[in-house]
């Protein structure tokens, strides 16, 4: 009977996720995932992008209260912008909350001045992430006071939604963008594993408002997908599938694979064979200096193997405990069968 686990174990898996910060403020990152099966780059990239832009928790200003102002179609004496324009500007204020409960923050300004988000008194539970953001322009000897309500939520919530129904008179609901992720783009390129050059490499660019680091945002999105997809698994793993998992080894079972599975060039493969390097475990225990002392083994072959090992999250000079095991052939066959 075909092992169920072959459906997922036979697929190539990414060996790591590489994060590269691309801004001084740590809110933009380039994320590279490789290698992936053909088509998986598009599948994962699209799913991650949708979740990142729709499902993460964040904070936003949901309503404002200005003395003597009852609706957004009013004008405030001494303020260049009308209330509707101010609301548009306030929607652009990015906030971070350290508590789950709503908080009221206050703004008090005396003109002449340009009123910015940094003038808001927030207390310890709320932080303004873009303090230079302009709210309005205040004339000389004029005063502006305002209370702003901050809440935690997700997605984009219109002011017409249910939370606006219970607001007291004089408090104006505004549209709230809770999502801490500002933009997500991705592209898929080819990458190489051994002699196969058409595996997928997923490259994502994620920008947040500073509430979360991009690495954390990506991790949360992956966890959301994991929780949603878990319900689709409606079968029990077979006992033979579990056996390989429960047999404890002091090293990765991948080291039991033969080096000829790496699909090396003929020259490199012959050098390893002549030096009696049979298993990947034999290979990674060697240092680069050891390899260069191998007859007919040059720098080109070394770089070829280093590149392949790196894609598998392996390297030369690794400390592999209890290698080689006494029953290496039996173990190698067992794990080979589990993959098949």
UniProtKB/Swiss-Prot annotation:
InterPro entries: DNA-dir_RNA_pol_insert, DNA-dir_RNA_pol_RpoA/D/Rpb3, DNA-dir_RpoA, RBP11-like, RNAP_asu_C, RNApol_insert_sf
Cysteine pairings via disulfide bonds: none
GO molecular function, one term: DNA binding
Gene Ontology cellular-component terms listed: cytoplasm; DNA-directed RNA polymerase complex
Enzyme Commission number(s) of this protein: 2.7.7.6
GO process annotations (BP): DNA-templated transcription
Location of region: Alpha N-terminal domain (alpha-NTD): 1-236
Catalytic activity: RNA(n) + a ribonucleoside 5'-triphosphate = RNA(n+1) + diphosphate
Entry-linked Pfam families: RNA_pol_A_bac (PF01000), RNA_pol_A_CTD (PF03118), RNA_pol_L (PF01193)
Region (Alpha C-terminal domain (alpha-CTD)): 251-340
Keywords: DNA-directed RNA polymerase, Nucleotidyltransferase, Transcription, Transferase
Domain notes: The N-terminal domain is essential for RNAP assembly and basal transcription, whereas the C-terminal domain is involved in interaction with transcriptional regulators and with upstream promoter elements.
Binding partners and assembly: Homodimer. The RNAP catalytic core consists of 2 alpha, 1 beta, 1 beta' and 1 omega subunit. When a sigma factor is associated with the core the holoenzyme is formed, which can initiate transcription.
Described purpose of this protein according to its UniProt entry: DNA-dependent RNA polymerase catalyzes the transcription of DNA into RNA using the four ribonucleoside triphosphates as substrates.
Family listed: Belongs to the RNA polymerase alpha chain family.
Designated name of the protein: DNA-directed RNA polymerase subunit alpha
Organism expressing this protein natively: Rickettsia canadensis (strain McKiel)
């Amino acid at each position: 009977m075909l092992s169920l686990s072959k459906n997922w174990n036979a697929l190539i898996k990414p060996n790591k996720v590489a994060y590269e910060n691309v801004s001084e403020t740590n809110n933009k990152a380039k994320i590279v995932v490789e290698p992936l099966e053909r088509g998986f780059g598009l599948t994962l990239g699209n799913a991650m992008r949708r979740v990142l832009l729709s499902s993460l928790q964040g904070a936003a200003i949901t309503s404002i209260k200005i003395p003597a102002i009852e609706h957004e179609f009013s004008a405030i004496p001494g303020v260049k912008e009308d209330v509707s324009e101010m609301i548009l500007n306030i929607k652009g204020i990015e906030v971070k909350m350290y508590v789950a409960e709503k908080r009221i923050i206050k703004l008090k300004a005396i003109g002449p001045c340009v009123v910015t988000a940094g003038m808001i008194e927030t207390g310890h539970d709320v932080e303004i992430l873009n303090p230079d953001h302009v709210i309005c322009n205040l004339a000389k000897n004029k005063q502006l006071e305002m209370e702003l309500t901050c809440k935690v939520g997700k997605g984009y919530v219109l002011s017409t939604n249910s939370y606006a129904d219970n607001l007291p008179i004089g408090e104006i609901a505004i549209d709230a963008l809770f999502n801490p992720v500002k933009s997500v783009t991705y592209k898929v390129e080819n990458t190489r594993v051994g002699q196969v050059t058409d595996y997928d490499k997923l490259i994502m660019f994620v920008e947040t408002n500073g509430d979360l680091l991009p690495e954390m945002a990506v991790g949360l999105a992956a966890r959301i997908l994991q929780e949603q997809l878990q319900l689709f698994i409606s079968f029990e793993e077979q006992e033979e599938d579990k056996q390989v998992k429960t047999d404890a080894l002091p090293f990765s079972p991948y080291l039991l694979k033969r080096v000829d599975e790496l699909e090396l060039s003929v020259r490199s493969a012959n050098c390893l064979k002549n030096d009696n390097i049979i298993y990947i475990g034999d290979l990674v225990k060697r240092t680069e200096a050891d390899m260069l002392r191998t007859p007919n083994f040059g720098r080109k072959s070394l770089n070829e193997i280093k590149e392949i090992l790196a894609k598998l999250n392996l390297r030369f000079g690794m400390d592999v405990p209890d290698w080689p095991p006494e029953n290496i052939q039996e173990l190698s066959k067992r794990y080979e069968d589990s993959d098949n």
